[in-house]
Amino acid sequence: MITLNSIANIRTGYTFREKVEEVAVGGNAYVVQIKDVRKIHQDGNSFNLPVESLPQINWTGKDNAFVSAGSVLLPARGGYFKASYLVPTDSVSMPVVVSSQFLILTPTKHMLAEFLCWILNQPAMQRALIESSQGTSMPMLRAETLKQLKIAVPSLKTQQQIIELNRLWEHEQQVTQALLKNRENMLKGVFQQLLKETN
């Protein structure tokens, strides 16, 4: 077990001074906020965060606020500490701005980002994150506290094996959820038809 800051650089996201104004199309940057991340987690049964699924904004700030795809994003407030992996893709040309609601983790060469996301979401690590948070009404994770968190670092080969198994598991969950949704829609149609026949 080693401290998190020995295998990842950790910084906070960008502090927006005003309400974030999202645009449907025509933005020049993507934005990451907790509300959008939670919805993507729930809808997709995955902690992989495709950049193109994020809302767009018209960005007028500096370039140093941009976050590279391949980073791990960890919510820093509100008691929801599920990490996300910002999935790299060749088709995305716009930069990404992450709000200060998140801590941004950029792993070193000894840690695969997708594995870091996975291990942070495991029950033992989630308990450690909750215990490390401060505040009662609005729990917060501080970067300095997170840096001292102890984490297991298996070989890169083992990390890759875990990633591949987790991808299969997430895919199975997505297929199962889709089948259940289709079944639900079919039954709703049957119920409506039966009700019509009784009138």
Give the residues covered by each predicted segment.
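A short beta-sheet element
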Residues: 76-118
